[in-house]
Amino acid sequence: MSTTKTIVVLPGDHVGTEITEEATKVLNAIAEKRPNIKFDFQHHLIGGAAIDATGVPLPDEALEASKKADAVLLGAVGGPKWGTGDVRPEQGLLKIRKELGLYANLRPCNFAFDSLLDMSPLKPEYARGTDFTVVRELVCGIYFGKRKEDTGDGVTWDSEQYSVPEVQRITRMAASLALQHNPPLPIWSLDKANVLASSRLWRKTVEETIKNEFPTLSVQHQLIDSAAMILVKNPTKLNGLVITSNMFGDIISDEASVIPGSLGLLPSASLASPPDTNKAFGLYEPCHGSAPDLPKGKVNPVATILSVAMMLKLSLDMVEEGIAVEKAVRKVIDNGIRTADLRGTNSTTEVGDAIAAAVKEFL
C-alpha cells in the first residue's frame, strides 16, 4: 500500500537552504528504495528570508501549510543583517512553536560515534557513555511571560509563569519517552526550587504526576546550577530523560551540545503530543544556528539529517527507515567522510551524497 507524507520545508536563513537540501536528498533516497513511500515537499519562508520577502518572520501561508502537514523540517533562522529590531527572524520561530502547540523540545546528547570521542572537550573517560535527552518545555515560561521594555526609565523586567497543567503535560511527555525503553529510562527534573516560586510548583507537579500516573518510573530532582556542574564533571550521571523549563532547557541543552564535539552532529524534535504511536506531529531542526559567516559548502548536514531520522521515527511511523538513516550517518562518519568541523575535508553535498547512498544499503 502506497503512502504519501506531506513535509513542509522551511529552509530559513544562510546555511538553512544547504542543510535542508541534504536532508530532503536522504528522504528521496528512501523513496527510491521503497516505492510505496512518497514524500510531498512543500517549501515556504521563515525568518529573515520571510522578512525580506513579506515583511513578517512567519507568513500566514507558511503557518497554514505547516498545520496541515505530517511534519515540518526547519533549517535555521537569524543573522546580523536583521539585528535586534522590532521585527526579528526569531519571532517566526517562537510563533510557529506556539501556533502548532509544540510544547516539548527533545535534544539528544549521546556518543553514537566512538570514532569522534577525541572531538569532545571532555576527556574520553568522562564523555564515553553519555546518553541523555533534554526534554525542554517550549511554549511557556519566561520566554512567553509578561515583560516590560525600557521606556526611558531605566527599568525592565521579564516574568516566568507556569501552571499545573503545563508542567503535567511536559512530565507526561518525558514519562512516555521513558516507557519506550526496557527497562524504562530514569528521569531527571531540573529546577531552581530553592529560589523561584515557579520552580517550586514545577518540582511539586513533576513529583506528583510521576507518583500518581507512572508509579513504575522514578524521578530525581536537581537544581539547575548543580546540574550544569554535573554535566561537565560526570555527564553520564544524567543519562536518561532530563526534563526542565523553557529557559533552563535552552541553556542546559546548549551546554550539553558541546560534549559530542560539534553542534553539527546534534538533532532536535519539537512535538505537539507524546509519540506513543510514532505519529506525533512535530517540527524537526538541527541544534545549530544559521552560521552567516560560514562559506558555502562548509556546513555539516549531519544534525539536520539526524533530525530527519527523528522525524521518521516519531512522526511518520517509519521506525525502520529512521534507524537506517542513523546507521548510514554512522557508517559515513566512521569512514572518514566529514566536514571541517569534524576535522574533515568533505563538502556539505559530499557528506549528504554519501549518507543518501548509504541509506539505500540499510533498507
Swiss-Prot record:
InterPro entries cross-referenced by the UniProt entry: IsoCit/isopropylmalate_DH_CS, IsoPropMal-DH-like_dom, Isopropylmalate_DH
Amino acids binding substrate: R97, R107, R136, D225
One function term, GO molecular function aspect: NAD binding
The keyword Glycoprotein appears for this protein: no
Cross-referenced PROSITE patterns: IDH_IMDH
EC number: 1.1.1.85
Residues at which Mg(2+) binds: D225, D250, D254
GO biological process, one term: L-leucine biosynthetic process
Endoplasmic reticulum listed as a keyword: no
Cofactor: Mg(2+); Mn(2+)
GO cellular component: cytosol
Sites where the protein binds NAD(+): 79-90, 289-300
Record key words, sorted: Amino-acid biosynthesis, Branched-chain amino acid biosynthesis, Cytoplasm, Leucine biosynthesis, Magnesium, Manganese, Metal-binding, NAD, Oxidoreductase
EC class (word): oxidoreductase
Catalysed reaction equations from the record: (2R,3S)-3-isopropylmalate + NAD(+) = 4-methyl-2-oxopentanoate + CO2 + NADH
Principal subcellular localisation of the protein: cytoplasm
Annotated cofactor note: Binds 1 Mg(2+) or Mn(2+) ion per subunit.
Family statement drawn from the similarity comment of this UniProt entry: Belongs to the isocitrate and isopropylmalate dehydrogenases family.
Main function: Catalyzes the oxidation of 3-carboxy-2-hydroxy-4-methylpentanoate (3-isopropylmalate) to 3-carboxy-4-methyl-2-oxopentanoate. The product decarboxylates to 4-methyl-2 oxopentanoate.
Subunit text: Homodimer.
Protein name: 3-isopropylmalate dehydrogenase
Organism expressing this protein natively: Maudiozyma humilis (Sour dough yeast)
